[in-house]
């Protein structure tokens, strides 16, 4: 449904929860106004909570429950303006990122396998996974030229060795 109603959308799933953070991006309509604000420190808060509970038995599952409680009632934020302002986000955290674009029809299975791998192998990661769906365009150098696609990004904090995590996840994109 989100795919049909939006120019593109993204979601950030939680690894041990059925909740996610969802973002839809569409051209503005007359009367649209900015409502709410982003929190550029949110990813730092996620890490502090993770570092506090990760050593406890069941701590990673506890982490997602705490995040669910904290974010479950978040009000929607609406941003309007030129695309260079609306699509850009303040980054106050250093991180490493690996991103692949897959055909839209392969996106859901790919993200499910990534989440399953993180859970089953108990990978120590709390940085949000990003899944972004974009409709086809006609721009020759675009990853979405001629077809709908999904960009899936995995991240790790800049001061944490990203290689073990990325090495586990990257083969999933090659299928």
Q: What do these predicted regions represent?
A:
Residues 1-175:
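Noncatalytic alpha-helical scaffold of FAD-dependent oxidoreductases
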């Amino acid at each position: 449904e989100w795919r049909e109603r939006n120019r593109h959308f993204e979601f950030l799933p939680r690894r041990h929860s059925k909740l996610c953070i969802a973002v839809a991006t569409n051209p503005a309509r007359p009367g649209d106004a900015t409502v709410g604000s982003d929190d550029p420190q949110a990813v730092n808060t996620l890490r502090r909570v993770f570092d506090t509970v990760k050593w406890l038995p069941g701590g990673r599952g506890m982490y997602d429950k705490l995040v669910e409680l904290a974010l479950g009632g978040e009000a929607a934020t609406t941003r309007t303006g030129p695309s260079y302002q609306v699509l850009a986000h303040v980054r106050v955290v250093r991180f490493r990122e690996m991103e692949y674009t897959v055909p839209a029809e392969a996106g859901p299975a790919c993200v499910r396998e990534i989440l399953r791998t993180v859970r089953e192998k108990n990978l120590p990661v709390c940085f949000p996974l990003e899944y972004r769906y974009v409709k086809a365009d006609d721009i020759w150098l675009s990853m979405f030229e001629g077809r709908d696609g999904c960009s899936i990004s995995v991240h790790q904090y800049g001061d944490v060795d990203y290689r073990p995590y990325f090495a586990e996840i990257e083969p999933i994109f090659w299928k």
